[in-house]
Structures are given as C-alpha cells and as structure tokens.
Amino acid sequence: ALGAEKKGAVLSLHNRVKGIRRDGNAFVIETENGEIAAKNIVDACGVWAPVIGKMVGLDIPIQARQGQILVSEQTFQVARRKVHEFGYMSTKFQSDGYKRPVSERVEKYGVAFVFEPTASNNFLIGSSRTFAGEDTRSSIEVMKAMAERAIRFFPVIADIKVIRSYSGLRPYTPDHMPIVSGTPVEGFYIAAGHEGDGIGLSPITGKVMADMIAGEEPFMDLSPLKFDRFAAGQA
C-alpha cells in the first residue's frame, strides 16, 4: 500500500463500504465518508469478499476458516529456524489420500505443527484450521490439541509456559485455490481466497491483476483460478 501511495494512489483507511451501484460505465462506491467513483473494482477483502460481492450481485464461495497461534514465554533457544510438518499441507487441502496417526482432537481441529522463533526469544506455535464463522476467540480445546502436537515434535516444550494465544481468519474456498479473476460484472475483479498463502502470493497476485485490468495478457495461465469454475461445477 505504501508503494502504491508513492506512485500516486490515495489510501482511504478505516472507511467501511456500504454499497456499490452503477452509474453509466463506472461504479459508485458508497462509503461511510462519502462516495468514490471508479471504473474498476478489485475485491481483495479476504473473508469479507462475499460481502462486497453481494453488493454487485455475485455469490463468492469464500468462508472464514479460523486459525490459532500460541505464544511462549521468553526462554532458551529451542530451535533456530522455522519448522513445520508435512501435515500442514494435508490439513489445508483436507487430503483423503493421506491420514496422519494423530489423536482425535488433533484431527478434529486440523492441527499441524508449526514452530517459529522470534528475535525476543519467544516462539510461536501453530497451526489449526476450524470453521467457526467470524469468531476470533481462542478455544482452550484447540490450544490443548496444538500443545499436544508441538510436544510430539519438541518434547522440551512441555516444560515451557504459553503466555497468550490469538486467532485469525483465513479466506477458504471449496477447492483450496484462490480466486484471481474477472467476473460477469464488467470491471469487477476478485483477488481473494488465498487462505494462509495471501502474504506470500500478494506480489504475483498484484502483478497478474494489474495485467488483467490493463487489458494485457498475464504471463501465466490463470484458468484454474477463474471465478466461473464454481458456476461450472468444476471445483
């Protein structure tokens, strides 16, 4: 956002969108702080992308999928680098072909071990995947499952205190792939549904989205990410 601002973009922060309507070939975006006219709109609102989509008559199949993080006390160096188990990917994609030998609660809450040290000598423990609407409250049962899985890989963690937990929401799609696409509503684009990969994929998403809006051919095949794959029953 700061880079875009340097190029002349105007940021309008903490300004809720209340509605979108057509005015000729342009959109009029109704916000809490007035109206904004735009030729094109990119819906990059993550778990709230469906809310914006409904304003132009689109049903965007994105759900909120909650994930929790545990934060340890300051302690000795348990590990120097980030570690995650293969189960992180199988839980994300809900693989039927691979089942881990894990406890019922680890399986129930989509828990997979992720460890990340910090510069302050705390460490972060993840991860979980549950459907809880837009609830971002931490669950003690999920925390227990995450601690159980962490101790399975690093037994020393059993002797280290957890000082807090927090949760966030990932934008989930039925086929676990993002939507990076134009739509039947001319000038309305979607860039959402990346689930836990949004930060890492943001540069390439921005590049191909800019190409689409400019009428240029993206350098890669985006057909697997098209919005209409859901309408066609392909997902």
Task: Name the predicted role of every residue range.
Residues G24-V28, S120-N122, F188:
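A generic structural signal for beta-strand entry/edge sites
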Residues V42:
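N-terminal Rossmann-like NAD(P) cofactor-binding module of classical short-chain dehydrogenase/reductase
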Residues H14-V17, K161-I163, L222-F227:
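Beta-strand segments within the central parallel beta-sheet cores of soluble alpha/beta enzyme folds
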Residues A1-K39:
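Helical element adjacent to the flavin cofactor pocket in flavoenzyme catalytic cores
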Residues A1-K7, V28, S128-A132, V185-G187, ...:
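Helix-loop-beta segment of a Rossmann-like dinucleotide-binding subdomain
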Residues G3-K7, V51, M55, M212-E216:
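Active-site catalytic microenvironments for nucleophilic, acid-base chemistry
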Residues G19, E35-I36, G46-S165, L169-P184:
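Active-site substrate-recognition segment that forms the wall
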